[in-house]
Structure formats: structure tokens, C-alpha cells
Amino acid sequence: MKTNDIRELTTAEIETKVKALKEELFNLRFQLATGQLENPTRIREVRKAIARMKTVVCEREIGINR
């Protein structure tokens, strides 16, 4: 999800998506540990998506407009 798409969401929607992505990340790490992970780059994608969403929420709290 692109940053501009994230900025169009409400804070509550972003927090819901972050929670879902954290669950997915947990499952991906579990699959990695058991050797069942087919696409290891998905872990990086999910981590970066979480970071983007948290950045947008933090920008809103501080009051930075982009």
C-alpha cells in the first residue's frame, strides 16, 4: 500500500490494518521458523507497510502536513 493511499484512510482504519499486518508478520515468522515460508521477501514488505502506517499516524499526532 502506497503512502498516499494510507494518508486517505482514517486513523482508526490504519490502526486496524496495522493490527492485521502484525498478525500476518507473526504467522510469516512462524512459517520461517518451521521452514514452510515460500516467499521470504514478504516479511520485509509487511514490516515496511507497518512502518509506513505508523509514520502516517505519528505525522498526524505531531501535525505535519504532507
UniProtKB/Swiss-Prot annotation:
- Specify the superkingdom: Bacteria
Q: Which is one Gene Ontology cellular component term of this protein?
A: cytosolic large ribosomal subunit
Per UniProt, the keywords (alphabetical) are: Ribonucleoprotein, Ribosomal protein
Tell me one GO biological process term: translation
**Listed InterPro entries:** Ribosomal_protein_uL29, Ribosomal_uL29, Ribosomal_uL29_CS, Ribosomal_uL29_sf
The UniProt GO MF terms for this protein read: structural constituent of ribosome
Q: Which family does it belong to?
A: Belongs to the universal ribosomal protein uL29 family.
The record, for PANTHER family, names: 60S RIBOSOMAL PROTEIN L35/50S RIBOSOMAL PROTEIN L29, LARGE RIBOSOMAL SUBUNIT PROTEIN UL29C
Report what the protein is called: Large ribosomal subunit protein uL29
- Provenance organism: Bacillus mycoides (strain KBAB4) (Bacillus weihenstephanensis)
The gene name reads: rpmC
